[in-house]
Amino acid sequence: MSADLNRDYEIGEEIGRGRFGVVHRCTSRSTGEAFAVKSVDRSNLADDLDRELAEIEPKLAQLAAAGNPGVVQVHAVYEDDSWTHMVMDLCSGPDLLDWVRLRRGAPVPEPVAADIVAQLAQALALCHRRGVAHRDVKPDNVVLDVEDDGENSSPRARLADFGSAAWIGADGGRAEGLVGTPHYVAPEVVSGGDYGEKADVWSAGVVMYVLLSGGALPFGGETAKDVLSAVMRGSVRFPPRLFSGVSPAAKDLMRRMMCRDEWRRFSAEQEQPT
């Protein structure tokens, strides 16, 4: 741990672990306020792309979060020759994946799912206007602040983990590289060419599908390769046993979000359900 980080924060228990780093609870020594700190040991990253992503993450996370209530806020960054530490909001609830799993296969009520997706769309729209593509939108990377007001109340949802993010500029720039999570990645990413911010919209469409189906995924397979093949060749279907109670408008929105033609796909601005 950085000496400067330890000077300013008391480091507590581990609360999460991901591909690149580990997350601990921490407490400000000056105010007593609780935060989360994500720590990445860059010296352990052998892949050039991984090192590049780890180096740029703090800058893109701060840019995406500033004045954006739908993104977990970054309060401080500490870096030395090997480590990067980001002090961030400590969210009170689970991530969206765990929240869905707690429902044991029951679909999220459509108004609640629509509200969560609208919050995600608003967050992504501001990220995209600032030239940041997240590139790994999935339930695991959406954290919740949940009020105990019944199953039909909507939690506050915030986008987290910019560890795969790319700078594309605010003028419709493009990114490259197979980055993201197989079940949520857009076909243009899988194809190996360049792609824009609408890859995030595809991923958000998969998130909406997961919410309304009670945890099912639109594209599956036994291996990551199988899943990516399904993403490339498949089309979105809504099995009646899972979607009989979902409105035509919600299904149409998901089709537009997961449109295979990137140029006809909704933008994050258009994505917000009504």
Predicted features along the sequence, with ranges:
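Conserved N-lobe ATP-binding subsite of Hanks-type protein kinase domains
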Residues: 22
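Conserved N-lobe beta3->alphaC-helix segment of eukaryotic protein kinase catalytic domains
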Residues: 40-65
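A conserved loop-to-beta-strand element in the N-lobe of protein kinase catalytic cores
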Residues: 72, 81-89, 97-98
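A short, aromatic-enriched beta-strand patch in the conserved N-lobe beta-sheet
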Residues: 76-77
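Conserved catalytic-loop aspartate of Hanks-type protein kinases
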Residues: 200
